[in-house]
Amino acid sequence: MTQDELKKAVGWAALEYVKPGTIVGVGTGSTASHFIDALATMKGQIEGAVSSSEASTAKLKSYGIPVFDCNEVDSLDIYVDGADEINHQMQMIKGGGAALTREKIIAAVAKTFVCIVDESKQVDVLGKFPLPVEVIPMARSYVARELVKLGGLPEYRENVVTDNGNVILDVYNLTILNPIELENKINSIAGVVTVGLFANRGADIVLMGTSEGVKTIK
């Protein structure tokens, strides 16, 4: 199977966790896009969705799936999204698509976070994929200097503005042995909106596309 076929397989496999009558948290990216395709087959059975990006919102609406503001819901039964990297503790790096802050908010609201990935995303230690950090524009240089102190090599992601009007620094050269500690440290830097480490709130279920089929990890 190609990588895209693996992504499609896990996107459709996630439908098993969607309960009729609920509002579904929906992520962003190529794998989440396959999940939206699958979710469209249940559009008459679910109340709607909360989306982590303008791109996902547009796709959901194109299928006629109602999209709610996160402030309109008290809780979400499920949140389905991909990851750029995931370790064996189900902690992740996310934010390659620059939607990390909204993704983190929806993950916090959701009772169950189902992460859908192909097997190339699994790693023993996080950090090979550059770690995205969403930053208030005026703090960009200061935050970059602070990230260097943590051993990182931050790079400004040019021509990218997040849906929240902020900028992204991608941090290279990190071997993340303690993801929770690093998440807390980076989040405490003035001017950081959030870091793309999902360690304090990791995944509850991982659906991993492999050459042998979809593997479920809980």
Swiss-Prot record:
The keyword Isomerase applies. Transmembrane segments: none annotated. Gene3D superfamilies: 3.30.70.260, 3.40.50.1360. Pathway: Carbohydrate degradation; pentose phosphate pathway; D-ribose 5-phosphate from D-ribulose 5-phosphate (non-oxidative stage): step 1/1. Keywords: Isomerase. It holds the Pfam family Rib_5-P_isom_A. It catalyses: aldehydo-D-ribose 5-phosphate = D-ribulose 5-phosphate. The active site is at E103 (proton acceptor). One of its GO terms (cellular component) is cytosol. Its EC number is 5.3.1.6. The keyword Glycoprotein does not apply. GO terms for molecular function: ribose-5-phosphate isomerase activity. Belongs to the ribose 5-phosphate isomerase family. Homodimer. NCBIfam families: PRK00702.1 (NF001924), rpiA (TIGR00021). Catalyzes the reversible conversion of ribose-5-phosphate to ribulose 5-phosphate. HAMAP family: Rib_5P_isom_A. PANTHER family: RIBOSE-5-PHOSPHATE ISOMERASE. This is Ribose-5-phosphate isomerase A. It comes from Proteus mirabilis (strain HI4320). The gene is rpiA.
